[in-house]
């Protein structure tokens, strides 16, 4: 490159330009920064804020954990289920027992057992539809996290209070309760839970090793659950065994079911009710006064069905960790599945379930912020649906009267409120049914209700329902078995002083000798004799005359009745008598004095008298005869 006759190296020129360019850029940046800071010092605060936002946007944060994205809303789908496993968990006699038996469809026959008028029903493959349902539940629902929380609530006596961040509102794949076939399928799964022997396959231990020498009778104690799985292993249904209704104890799980029923669904352990109720604790301290702390302690023992159901669910989820779980049950099994669903946030469909809001309030179940732990029926988005009809006294909460079948069997069913939604078939109005315990059976619900209706009923919540309104529930410190609670009242004691003591009391008074009593009245009377022969209603002595202004003296008759009547009256001949009244003079006939000689002509004729010839049935004379009385002077 030439400049004014001088040769210049192009590389040197390029380097110089680069240095000058870098110098100019650096100087310009410093000047611009100085002017910008001066401008911001005199600008409004909003400008400073905008600068701060731009400044933070330029900061590069270090890499952190990847936050989970919002779960996708499940699409409606159709599932085909088959029975895969049967679980059995001990409760009372064998609390550590937990066994499982697999069902092989090529070798096993799955059926509903015959019941009364219903024959056996084979179950091959069951179809059901699903739909998304919002459920407010814990974000971390693993049994290893939830179970210690529930155990702590059981020890403290109240539900755990969790932050709102621990809860989430999820769209969960749930049974389509508006589809009749889906409801029928779940009912069949519930009915199948009553079948105890499907195959002759051996049971395998799930929990600790079971002593084979004590193998006799274990099937009569515990909770039975049947597990249905769809073809893709993505959805499973657990059907829990309900109450085996019986009047007297002894067969199967009847005794244990009765104890759990009366713990769960009575106001105060079946006390102060009907004399046939099976009492299961002693927590009542007065008339309709109950120590709720005592009831809670009796209800939360781990050898009850609720604890067994949680452990059964834990083992099933270990076998299918990624599957969506549905719960179903009938009667007591339906109530237990509802409480299990509220614990882990699972979809639940029950049939003729006993109202379970009362025991749910005593178990210390986790509740979301803003919900009432005392009234679970007020919770929203629980994902629980209770199907039943109006002719079932257990479902509608009226099986507690003196003549009710539940009372006759020893069951105290006093609860009336369901948590979640109620789907009621009004068979009383639609079909003219009468309320009776016979309609409570699941086979009757399947064949006579669900299959007979063209659709399904509308499901509604009942948040205004209340249990045990007449009872006064109070809490104690839990150190005593029972506590007596009496309100402070002011009472007035009346004292009566007696001036005499009765030595011989009678039925209606005192039998002692009477004493003269003086009163302030103007008339004074006194008795001149005492009672020597007291009787039941008075004195048997002859009455004495009392002084008065008019004295009347009556002469006692000198004759007695020789011929009494059949029932009353006297049949003797009537003699004429004359009664002299005061102030009246009666002329008495006077006869001449007798002389020494006797003459028949001196006989005096007396007045005529009447004589009864015939009398009637009551002794009254019907026919009279008149006779002349004659007498001789020598008779005088």
Curated annotation (Swiss-Prot):
Membrane-traversing stretches: 20-42
GO CC annotations on file: multivesicular body membrane; vacuolar lumen
EC number: 3.1.1.3
GO biological process, one term: multivesicular body membrane disassembly
Topology in membrane: Single-pass type II membrane protein
Ranges of Low complexity composition bias in the record: 479-500
Chemical reaction(s) catalysed: a triacylglycerol + H2O = a diacylglycerol + a fatty acid + H(+)
CDD domains: Lipase_3
Record: glycosylation sites: 211, 233, 291, 315, 477
Chief subcellular location: membrane
Region annotation Disordered: where it falls in the sequence: 478-500
Protein location: Endosome, Multivesicular body membrane; Prevacuolar compartment membrane
MF-aspect GO terms: phospholipase activity; triacylglycerol lipase activity
Cytoplasmic compartment segments: 1-19
Pfam families: Lipase_3
Entry keyword set: Autophagy, Endosome, Glycoprotein, Hydrolase, Lipid degradation, Lipid metabolism, Membrane, Signal-anchor, Transmembrane, Transmembrane helix
Membrane-side (Lumenal) residue stretches: 43-636
Gene disruption: observed consequences: Significantly decreases the radial growth of colonies under nutrient-rich conditions. Strongly reduces conidiation. Strongly reduces the production of deoxynivalenol (DON), an important virulence determinant.
Domain of life: Eukaryota
Similarity remark: Belongs to the AB hydrolase superfamily. Lipase family.
Protein function: Lipase which is essential for lysis of subvacuolar cytoplasm to vacuole targeted bodies and intravacuolar autophagic bodies. Involved in the lysis of intravacuolar multivesicular body (MVB) vesicles. The intravacuolar membrane disintegration by ATG15 is critical to life span extension. Autophagy is required for proper vegetative growth, asexual/sexual reproduction, and full virulence. Autophagy is particularly involved in the biosynthesis of deoxynivalenol (DON), an important virulence determinant.
Subunit structure and binding partners: Binds to both phosphatidylinositol (PI) and phosphatidylinositol 3,5-bisphosphate (PIP2).
Protein name listed in UniProt: Putative lipase ATG15
Species, as recorded: Gibberella zeae (strain ATCC MYA-4620 / CBS 123657 / FGSC 9075 / NRRL 31084 / PH-1)
């Amino acid at each position: 490159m030439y400049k004014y006759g001088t040769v210049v190296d192009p590389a040197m020129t390029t380097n110089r330009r680069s240095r000058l360019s870098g110098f100019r850029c650096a100087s310009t940046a410093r000047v611009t920064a100085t002017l910008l800071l001066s401008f911001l010092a005199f600008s409004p605060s909003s400008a400073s804020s905008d600068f701060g936002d731009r400044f933070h946007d330029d900061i590069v944060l270090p890499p952190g954990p990847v936050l989970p994205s919002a779960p996708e809303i499940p699409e409606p789908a159709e599932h085909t289920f088959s029975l895969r496993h049967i679980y059995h968990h001990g409760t009372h006699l064998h609390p550590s027992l937990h066994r499982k038996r697999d069902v092989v469809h090529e070798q096993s026959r799955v059926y509903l057992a015959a019941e009364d008028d219903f024959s056996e029903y084979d179950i091959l493959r069951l179809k059901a539809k699903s739909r998304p349902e919002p459920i407010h539940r814990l974000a971390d629902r693993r049994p290893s996290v939830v179970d210690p929380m529930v155990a702590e609530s059981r020890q403290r006596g109240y539900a755990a209070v969790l932050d709102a961040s621990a809860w989430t509102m999820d769209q969960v794949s749930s049974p389509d309760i508006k589809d009749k076939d889906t409801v029928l399928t779940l009912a069949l799964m519930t009915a199948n839970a009553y079948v105890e022997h499907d195959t002759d396959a051996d049971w395998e231990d799930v929990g600790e090793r079971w002593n084979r020498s004590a193998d006799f009778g274990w099937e009569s104690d515990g909770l039975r659950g049947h597990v249905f799985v769809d073809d893709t292993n993505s959805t499973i249904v657990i059907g829990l065994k309900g109450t085996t209704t019986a009047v007297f104890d002894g067969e199967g799980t009847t005794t244990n079911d009765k104890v759990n029923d009366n713990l769960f669904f009575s106001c105060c352990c079946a006390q102060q009710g009907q004399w046939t109720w099976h009492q299961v604790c002693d927590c009542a301290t007065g008339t309709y006064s109950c120590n709720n702390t005592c009831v809670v302690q009796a209800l939360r023992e781990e050898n009850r069905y609720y604890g067994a159901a949680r452990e059964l669910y834990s083992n099933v989820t270990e076998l299918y960790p990624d599957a969506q779980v549905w719960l179903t049950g009938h009667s007591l099994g339906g109530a237990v599945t509802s409480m299990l669903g509220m614990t882990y946030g699972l979809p639940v469909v029950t049939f003729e379930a006993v109202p379970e809001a009362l025991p749910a309030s005593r178990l210390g179940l986790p509740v979301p912020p803003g919900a009432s732990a005392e009234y679970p029926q007020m919770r929203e988005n629980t994902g629980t649906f209770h199907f039943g009809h109006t002719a079932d006294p257990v479902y509608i909460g009226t099986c507690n009267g003196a003549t009710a079948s539940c009372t006759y069997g020893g069951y105290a069913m006093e609860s009336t409120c369901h948590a979640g939604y109620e789907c009621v078939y009004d068979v009383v109005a639609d079909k003219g049914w009468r309320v009776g315990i016979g309609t409570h059976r699941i086979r009757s619900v399947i064949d006579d209700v669900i299959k007979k209706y063209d659709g399904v009923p509308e499901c509604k919540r009942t948040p205004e329902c209340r249990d045990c309104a007449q009872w006064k529930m109070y809490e104690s410190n839990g150190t005593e078995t029972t506590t007596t609670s009496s309100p402070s009242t002011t009472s007035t004691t009346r004292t009566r002083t007696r001036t005499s003591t009765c030595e011989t009391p009678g039925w209606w008074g005192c039998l002692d000798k009477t004493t003269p009593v003086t009163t302030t009245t103007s008339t004074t009377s006194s008795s001149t004799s005492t009672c020597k022969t007291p009787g039941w209603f008075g004195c048997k002595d002859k009455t004495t005359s009392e002084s008065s202004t008019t004295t009347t003296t009556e002469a006692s008759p000198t004759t007695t009745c020789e011929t009494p009547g059949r029932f009353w009256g006297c049949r003797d001949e009537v003699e004429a008598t004359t009664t002299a009244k005061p102030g009246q003079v009666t002329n008495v006939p006077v006869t001449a004095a007798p002389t020494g000689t006797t003459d028949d002509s001196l006989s005096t004729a007396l007045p005529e008298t009447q004589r009864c010839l015939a009398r009637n049935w009551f002794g009254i004379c019907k026919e009279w005869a008149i006779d002349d009385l004659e007498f001789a002077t020598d008779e005088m």
